[in-house]
Structures are given as C-alpha cells and as structure tokens.
Design a protein with these regions (language model features):
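N-terminal secretory signal peptides and thylakoid transit peptides that target proteins
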Residues: 6-33
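A short acidic/small-residue loop/turn micro-motif
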Residues: 34-40, 98-100
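N-terminal glycine-/serine-/threonine-rich phosphate-binding loop
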Residues: 57-61, 86, 90-92, 100-103
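A short, well-structured edge-of-sheet supersecondary motif
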Residues: 71-95, 311-312
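Short active-site loop at a secondary-structure junction
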Residues: 78, 94-114, 118
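A common structural microfeature
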Residues: 79-81, 106, 126, 143
Length: 368
C-alpha cells in the first residue's frame, strides 16, 4: 500500500516525604485523639466538615526523585553534570554547572568546518533521473536511471516529486530497464562496527541514500500473532517495501538479528520484546536498491510504470544519450550542516566528509 499523506511515571511514594508526613499526621491524631474527640463533641456541625483541608501548592513535587538521588542510585563515580529546564528556559535543577565537559559528537563540528571549507556554503547535492532515449507516445525509448550524488537528506517525498516531474513531461513508462546509480560515493556496509547492528543511526552509506538509510518497522498484536509492516515513510509518501523483511521468532536475545543478502535485508525480532505493539526505525544495508524500490512505488502510484530497479556498475554520464528528465536539489550545505549539528546525524557527517574529500581530488573508499 502507498499512503499519501511520556506519559510521566511517578515513582513510588512509599518512602517519600509525602508518605512520612501522612504517617506522622496519623500518629499525631492518635496521640491527641481523646482531646480532639472532646472538642469535636462540643463543636457546631459546621466546624466538623468531612472535607479535608487543601494540600499546600507544590506538595506533589516532593514525591519526585531528584537528580542527585538518580546519580547516587546509578553509582556513577565519574564527573556528572546536567541541567533540567522547563519550556521557558528556567533551570529547575542542575549539577556540576561549572564543570567543563566536551560536547557530544564533537567531531561533527570539525567535519562541518572541513565540508564548508572545501565545498562552500552554497553547495547542494543533486539527484537526477536520466533517460537514454527520446519519449515516444509517453514511453522512454530506452532506459531510465536514478542517479544519486550522495545526498544524505533525500527522502521518499523527494522521490515522489521527481516522479511528478516525469508525469509533467508526459512520461508513462519505459521500453528498457530501470537502473539506480549510487557510484558517486563508495558503498560502505556500516558506519561503526563497534555499535549495535540494529541501531538506526548506524546504517550503510552509498552514493544514493534514502530516508537516512532507515526503514520503518511497525508491529501490532493481533490475537496470538503480530501484524508486521516495513515502509519508507516520509510526510506525504509511505510506500511499503520488500527490500527489508521481518519475522517474529521465539528467543530471548538478541532482540533483533540481521542476515545480509544481495537482494534483501532479512531481519528477525524476539517475540518477547514486542509487547502489544509499537514501531521503530531500522538501518538499511542495501540503500541503492532501497531507493530504487521506493522510486518505482511512488512513480507507479502517479501513473509511471517502471520495472524493478537494477544496479548500475559505472556512473551514468551527462551526454546527449543520457538526458536529464528530472532533478532534485538538496538544501544548501549551510542548512544541512545546521540540521546535522542539531540532531547529531551520523550519516550526514560521514557523507559530508567523503564528499569534501572527493572535491579535493581524493578517492576515499572507507571512513578511515
């Protein structure tokens, strides 16, 4: 199908100040019970209201676990600092505010400077659709090629817009094959082999990337089984994909397991870890074919019939025989860098480094 489109848990208060207050209050009432009863007997009815007095404002906050208690429970022996603020920016609680610590993912700042220096702030990634022949009666007389430049921000909606450009040209199909070209950058299996394989921030890299090379896995409990869904969702388009499959297995650990293949990412998940339902992103190990499958889906949905995507071994040239029929430009590099630093996006950082090195005349084949 194609779709065009915390709660806060309160800690136990058994040992909280609120509970101690209640017990002490109860003890006081018991000790003074006789006097209280005598006074109550002679008091007018209006003074013997069954409604309790209101609690003071902010009393519920006493039941919350403080940050200091959390640090103590975790037995953290190193330098710990934090700051908790509300929506207005008011600091509610802080620890070690004067401790100088390096920011997270500090290497991304260096990568940003490197990319801006060698690519320029106005640099854009361009994704193209190229035809190897003329259009006759709505059909390209030859092949169609989806050519990537490494754009780390390309998503399913951008592919949908590319397909829309084909529609605007009156293209309804092709007589040849449909290829995906991801040769602008080397194919790198995983960003960091020391990280968990199923972490969505640890995908593969190629010259054609999509949705940060992640696939959306969703599950819902249906009786004794689960309904599973794998899709390439963005804001407008969310096509189901077959490039990644999932099965539920009876095991403890690992929660997720992956088997690499030439035509499909085969995943399995522990049944005991699923609960009643949920969703999460998983990394894609076949990004070029992933992008190709999604492009076929969004194109078919708009009336452009394309066959299954195939790899291209050599980069498609810009010649008369390879005519550009659709094109998508990313945002300027300055905006891409800003987004990367805000969300600490690993894929973007690595691609910027590879692309900047290529602009210098280097030919990096890995991340080291």
């Amino acid at each position: 199908t194609l779709r065009m489109t915390d709660p806060r848990s309160t800690p136990s208060t058994l040992s909280s100040p609120v509970s101690r207050l209640s017990r002490r209050a109860a003890l006081g009432l018991m000790l003074g019970g006789g006097a209280s009863a005598a006074i109550a007997q002679g008091a007018p009815a209006v003074m013997r209201s069954p409604l309790p007095l209101p609690r003071p404002d902010g009393l519920h906050k006493l039941s919350y676990t403080s940050g200091a208690e959390l640090v103590e429970r975790a037995r953290l022996t190193g330098a710990v600092s934090y700051a908790v603020a509300d929506d207005t920016g008011k600091i509610l609680e802080a620890r070690g505010v004067d401790v100088a610590l390096p920011p997270a993912s500090v290497a991304k700042a260096v990568t940003s400077i490197y990319a801006l220096e060698h690519l320029g702030g106005d640099f854009v990634f361009t994704t193209k659709v190229m035809a190897t022949g003329p259009v006759v009666d709505g059909k390209v007389q030859g092949d169609l090629i989806l050519v990537g430049s490494g754009d780390p921000t390309l998503d399913s909606d951008a592919l949908g817009a590319l397909a829309g450009q084909l529609v605007a040209l009156g293209i309804t199909g092709i007589t040849g094959a449909f290829y995906v070209d991801g040769t602008a950058l080397p194919q790198i299996e995983i960003i960091d082999d020391q990280q968990t394989e199923f972490a969505s921030y640890n995908p593969s890299i190629s010259g054609l990337n999509l949705n940060y090379n992640r696939v959306y896995f969703e599950w819902k409990k249906e009786g004794d089984t689960f309904a599973l869904k794998m899709d390439a969702r963005a804001r407008k388009f969310a096509p189901d994909v077959r490039i990644a499959s999932m099965s539920v297995v009876d095991r403890g650990l690992p929660v997720f397991d992956h088997e690499a293949g030439n035509a499909q990412d085969v995943w399995s998940v522990s049944r005991s870890a699923l609960g009643k339902g949920g969703a999460r992103w998983l990394p894609v190990r076949l990004p070029r074919l992933y992008a190709g499958e999604v492009f076929v889906a969004v194109a078919n949905a708009q009336g452009v019939e394309l066959p299954q995507a195939l790899h291209i071994a050599k980069r498609a040239p810009d010649t008369a025989e390879h005519r550009i029929v659709a094109q998508h430009d990313s945002q300027a590099l300055t905006k891409i860098v800003k987004h990367m630093l805000k969300y600490s996006t690993n894929l973007t950082a690595e691609i910027l480094g590879l692309t900047a090195s290529g602009a210098r005349g280097l030919d990096p084949q890995d991340l080291y």
